[in-house]
């Protein structure tokens, strides 16, 4: 996957799951580990890292401090 695709996946997970996106990605990461899917594990590790870099979802009409 390209860097752009990884960022797109991270953004999509945040849109779908809000502040639970990190937890969702972590569960998928664990599933890849249990399945011994090294490529899938790497992808989800990259997505998880990008979600954490994006920070928390701030509801519309509020400001982040």
Model-assigned labels for residue ranges:
Residues 53-65:
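Short, charged, intrinsically disordered terminal tails
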Residues 1, 48, 61-62:
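Intrinsically disordered/low-complexity terminal segments and short unstructured peptides
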Residues 1-12, 65:
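Short, charge-rich, low-complexity alpha-helical interaction segments
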Residues 4-6, 31, 60:
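Generic signature of intrinsically disordered, low-complexity, basic-rich segments
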Residues 11-56:
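Amphipathic, hydrophobic secondary-structure cores in small proteins
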